[in-house]
């Protein structure tokens, strides 16, 4: 049986990095069937919606989805909504999984191999804001249900890793009702995972420790806003957003995406770095149970990052296509 993979290029360099990731996926030799769909700003301009209903239907008909990048306007546009935020809510993709691992590139700290698991559906990102004259108020929603399931997802990830360690990053010392509910709930769920070493850490200390001693961390679970910040910090430790993959995972489907934006300044020039998209594809293979193929893809990427060619953002002069073909050749040699 072939795996059905939904491909959404999105905007900007998404049109370059998703075809690159597809090329690498095809080189794995796995039985794959690709289904193309559209979403993003370009789709909104053309069709009046950033996520057409048929795109949602295609995602639901596939085993997993690989998304490229989406542009967001810098002004308020009536009727527009961010494609990824919409899909997270519509498909209940409650776990945002962001690995940060040392790579053989300039600026990457050695010894980093961690995963940040971020609750993806609530917190301050419920976008319930209001303003009264000169005062603006935003609601933060933390529920026991969402805290239980993100805690369980993070604990499963930690249980499957060699160090089996989970840090719960929180701000319960200042926000005891909301952050305290999250912390207490994850601790309660952790009783079902006796093999996992569970510790809690105040988020500001966590940020400092990530900078000073990132090698101490294995898996970190936290709330939406805090995870959004910590995961970009972690990406900065290992080479930046251009190398950062991610997965938005629910109980029935998942959407994987490179963390970088649509990069309109280089879109169409053929020099975009496809590493994050290819590593997101590797995460997708792991999600599908093809763990050996996922490891081979990651190994092939590291081989090319180490010996070249590299794209301009990493100090080289390779095109997107040249880098991709080098990864394909490395993959074939493994």
From Swiss-Prot:
Residue numbers binding NADH: 70-72, 173, 261-265, 273
Note: In vitro directed evolution leads to mutagenesis of key residues and increased activity with 3-isopropylmalate.
Cofactor(s) it depends on: Mg(2+)
Protein name per its UniProtKB record: Isocitrate/homoisocitrate dehydrogenase
Cofactor note: Binds 1 Mg(2+) ion per subunit.
Record-stated family: Belongs to the isocitrate and isopropylmalate dehydrogenases family.
Site residues, Important for substrate specificity and discrimination against 3-isopropylmalate: 85
GO annotation terms (biological process): isocitrate metabolic process; lysine biosynthetic process via aminoadipic acid; tricarboxylic acid cycle
Known pathway: Amino-acid biosynthesis; L-lysine biosynthesis via AAA pathway; L-alpha-aminoadipate from 2-oxoglutarate: step 4/5
EC number of this enzyme: 1.1.1.286
GO molecular function, one term: metal ion binding
UniProt binding sites for (2R,3S)-homoisocitrate: 72, 85, 88, 98, 118, 125, 171, 173
PANTHER family, alphabetized: DECARBOXYLATING DEHYDROGENASES-ISOCITRATE, ISOPROPYLMALATE, TARTRATE, ISOCITRATE DEHYDROGENASE [NAD] SUBUNIT ALPHA, MITOCHONDRIAL
Keyword set, alphabetical order: Amino-acid biosynthesis, Lysine biosynthesis, Magnesium, Metal-binding, NAD, Oxidoreductase
Catalytic activity annotation: (2R,3S)-homoisocitrate + NAD(+) = 2-oxoadipate + CO2 + NADH; D-threo-isocitrate + NAD(+) = 2-oxoglutarate + CO2 + NADH
Outcome (variant: residue 125 to A): Reduces catalytic efficiency with isocitrate
The species this protein was found in: Thermus thermophilus (strain ATCC BAA-163 / DSM 7039 / HB27)
Effect of residue 217 to Y: Confers enzyme activity with 3-isopropylmalate
Phenotypic consequence of gene deletion: Does not grow on minimal medium. Requires alpha-aminoadipate or lysine for growth.
Task performed by this protein: Catalyzes the NAD(+)-dependent oxidative decarboxylation of homoisocitrate to 2-oxoadipate (alpha-ketoadipate), a reaction involved in lysine biosynthesis through the alpha-aminoadipate pathway. In addition, has high activity with isocitrate, but is inactive with 3-isopropylmalate.
Lineage of origin: Bacteria, Thermotogati, Deinococcota, Deinococci, Thermales
Effect of mutating residue 86 to A: Confers enzyme activity with 3-isopropylmalate
Gene: hicd
